């Protein structure tokens, strides 16, 4: 929360391009030329590969980076079990999957001294982390910067800030994410989160499955949606710190801790494509109708985690960014829907065009597969009678985690005080308008 951290965050340099083969060195000459693991790595460093995919996965899907570090990652004492806090991991068996529509207000204020990891609160998810399938929805609310380091062996983390800026100090370098931006931390990458404001709040998608990638564009063509060039990767930056550093590792659903005698954020140079990124959601190139009808929300996909069935995602990350609505003879808000996919929605700022009230920044809603949902009565009545002039939607930024499997809520989410008890009421006032004579 210091001014120094804010100044550091705002002055960062970056590499650009999602999925690129990046290379960076914090000290000239630290990156070996022409080979990955020379007999003696430059500057007395250790060469180490971090694999985000199996060695033999197809080249287009292969993720790995080579790190050149002061100490090898293997140089640490045994890990011991730590308290999981409010973090839960798939398979989710505390409650039964629920077909009811659910909506939550924002998380309550945490106790003083709560850092990013301590402020994680699991809402629910699906799949099995040990089988590398499925996902989890977490929220976070923190009021203290981390003085420990965290890594997640169970999946990659898509962090969606809603309030308060974050400075992520990773093995690859530093990244800065504000509300309206997202940060993607690959599986196994160590990092620490500094808060840039008095507190920070937001959402996290923990993806146990295939790494997120840009969606195929099909008939859209070569351009549109999220552009690869707008994703920012860090330049190398390292900590040369001797002394006790706590490292927390999430492994098969549990937290484990060890005290290193040095900082593990000691990578002086690196190259590869298994790297963290940030992305500004306002750069999303929104596509939509210029004739009639509301397009399916897949047109708003930023990133997708593919499954073994083409087009059927383990999880999609979708954003409803500022856009124009111009459809003629069209009900312009999102339509009434029953979906084979399950949808968790969150709100970063403003309002969402399908809900007049109750869906607030920091809150969220869950509509499991085949659970009917759509605009509330006020939105339906207003949109059905609206004059169809071109309309700019620029007062809100909502997103969705959409997944192929039902999302089972955790016990803490199903019983939370901030769970709205009467969410179904938003649809109860919808009137009968049927007139057979028409």
From Swiss-Prot:
UniProt cross-references to InterPro entries, sorted A to Z: HgmA_C, HgmA_N, Homogentis_dOase, Homogentis_dOase_bac, RmlC-like_jellyroll, RmlC_Cupin_sf
Q: Name one GO molecular function term.
A: iron ion binding
Which Gene3D superfamilies does the protein's record reference? Jelly Rolls (2.60.120.10)
Where in this protein does the record put region Disordered?
A: 16-40
- Protein EC: 1.13.11.5
Q: Which GO terms describe its biological process?
A: L-phenylalanine catabolic process; tyrosine catabolic process
Is the keyword Metal-binding assigned to this protein?
yes
Q: Which domain of life is it from?
A: Bacteria
* Positions annotated to bind Fe cation: 337, 343, 373
What's one GO-annotated cellular component?
A: cytoplasm
The record's section on CDD domains has: cupin_HGO_N (cd07000)
- Pathway per the UniProt entry: Amino-acid degradation; L-phenylalanine degradation; acetoacetate and fumarate from L-phenylalanine: step 4/6
Q: Which residues bind homogentisate?
A: 352, 373
Q: Which residues form the active site?
A: 294
Q: Which UniProt keywords apply?
A: Dioxygenase, Iron, Metal-binding, Oxidoreductase, Phenylalanine catabolism, Tyrosine catabolism
Question: Which cofactors does the annotated protein need, by name?
Answer: Fe cation
Q: What does this protein do?
A: Involved in the catabolism of homogentisate (2,5-dihydroxyphenylacetate or 2,5-OH-PhAc), a central intermediate in the degradation of phenylalanine and tyrosine. Catalyzes the oxidative ring cleavage of the aromatic ring of homogentisate to yield maleylacetoacetate.
Quaternary structure, from the entry: Hexamer; dimer of trimers.
HAMAP family (UniProt xref): Homogentis_dioxygen
Name the family the entry cites. Belongs to the homogentisate dioxygenase family.
What is the recorded name of this protein? Homogentisate 1,2-dioxygenase
Q: Which organism is it from?
A: Streptomyces avermitilis (strain ATCC 31267 / DSM 46492 / JCM 5070 / NBRC 14893 / NCIMB 12804 / NRRL 8165 / MA-4680)
The gene name reads hmgA
